[in-house]
Amino acid sequence: MSLLSVIFIALGLSADCFAVSIGIACTHASIKSRVIWRVAGTFGLFQAGMVVIGFFAGLSVIDIISAFDHWIAFGLLLFIGVRMIYEALQGEDDQELVKLDLTRGLGLLGVAVATSIDALAVGLAFAVEETNIGLAALLIGLVSLTVSFLGFKLGNRISFMASRWVGVAGGLVLVFIGLKILAEHTLGWDILL
């Protein structure tokens, strides 16, 4: 998988982190920089870690699935992307999550796991595509950290409803990457991304 594809996947995966960061920023009057860095760093670490876990889980079954690899990668990315779009359009009331402090402890752990579950399946897709997992995990972690940080910084300036469309955009990116993988393997197209 190309570096550009990995970057787009990283951006797609980071959409949930961005939306949650905006939500947290919108519900806290003022957040100290160290808290922002702690939350953004945790999001980045969990995204990278889940990709690695998914990758190595995928390697254990690679011989069995090599004949269907492109369909599996497409299906996983399509499922994740469509689920992200669906969840974004559902308009779940994130205000209910604020009852628990999402900037530390169990609240932070819970939201970090929730925003990184998709990365687990992407790690499996990376194993199928024989992607350089070290570079992919590093990029996904750094992009998630950066996007989360930006979400916090922009949270007070952006309407809370905007986070819904960020989730839709992230889902569409993952669906597009899935379609790209399918086209490359079934039609022999060499798509730049």
Curated annotation (Swiss-Prot):
Coiled-coil features, chain-numbered ranges: none
Keyword terms: Cell membrane, Ion transport, Manganese, Membrane, Transmembrane, Transmembrane helix, Transport
Subcellular location: Cell membrane
Superkingdom to which the source organism belongs: Bacteria
GO cellular component: plasma membrane
Topology of the protein relative to the lipid bilayer: Multi-pass membrane protein
Transmembrane regions: 6-26, 48-68, 71-91, 108-128, 132-152, 165-185
Molecular function (Gene Ontology), one example: manganese ion transmembrane transporter activity
Record's function text: Probably functions as a manganese efflux pump.
Family: Belongs to the MntP (TC 9.B.29) family.
Name under which the protein is recorded: Putative manganese efflux pump MntP
Organism: Dehalococcoides mccartyi (strain ATCC BAA-2100 / JCM 16839 / KCTC 5957 / BAV1)
